[in-house]
């Protein structure tokens, strides 16, 4: 024990509105013509694996599902880009080139408004304002966010160094983020 306190928790919470009902995130998610966010998260019901499951033995397989009760599922609040607000916001998220989601899109033929597993998505920003408008994407383009490559690198460097100062990023990871920013196209 070196006597240092751990950093404050970054877990989503009700009391600071970083953990919310999925409908709030659905309504706030940026409008992107080719993206249809799920209307709700996957539903969650209690499952009974049998009387000795606490000892590590499942005697009911598949488990019995109690549909008389449904857990309330909450999700992290998102920023204007659709990226989660709570958590440790690495430079990928705090100086973004895309939106990262905890859900994936489904085809129009197979439940387009439903969640597909828990596989995430990477939704890159348009390069220019003209491309953004053509795509029907309300998120600012890369050119609108970062006037130059050097500006982008400076912002990544600042974000990475701040995480390092807070004890959340190793020195070698700061260097990796900066190198990746310099090589971003």
Regions found by a protein language model. Name each.
Residues 1-185:
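C-terminal His-loop and adjacent cap/lid subdomain of alpha/beta-hydrolase
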């Amino acid at each position: 024990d070196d006597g240092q306190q751990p950093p404050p928790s970054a877990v989503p919470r009700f009391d600071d509105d970083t953990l919310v009902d999925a409908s709030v995130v659905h309504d706030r998610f940026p409008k992107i013509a080719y993206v249809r966010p799920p209307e709700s998260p996957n539903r969650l019901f209690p499952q009974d694996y049998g009387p000795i499951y606490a000892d590590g033995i499942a005697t009911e397989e598949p488990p019995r599902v109690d549909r008389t009760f449904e857990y309330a599922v909450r999700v992290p609040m998102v920023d204007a880009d659709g990226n989660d607000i709570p958590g440790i916001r690495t430079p990928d998220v705090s100086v973004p080139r895309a939106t990262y989601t905890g859900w994936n899109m489904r085809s129009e033929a197979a439940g387009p408004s439903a969640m597909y597993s828990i596989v995430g998505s990477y939704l890159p920003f348009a390069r220019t304002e003209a491309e953004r408008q053509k795509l029907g994407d309300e998120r600012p383009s890369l050119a609108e966010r970062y006037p130059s490559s050097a500006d982008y690198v400076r912002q990544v460097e600042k974000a990475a160094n701040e995480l390092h100062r807070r004890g959340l990023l190793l020195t070698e990871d700061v260097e990796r983020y900066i190198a990746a920013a310099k090589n971003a196209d």
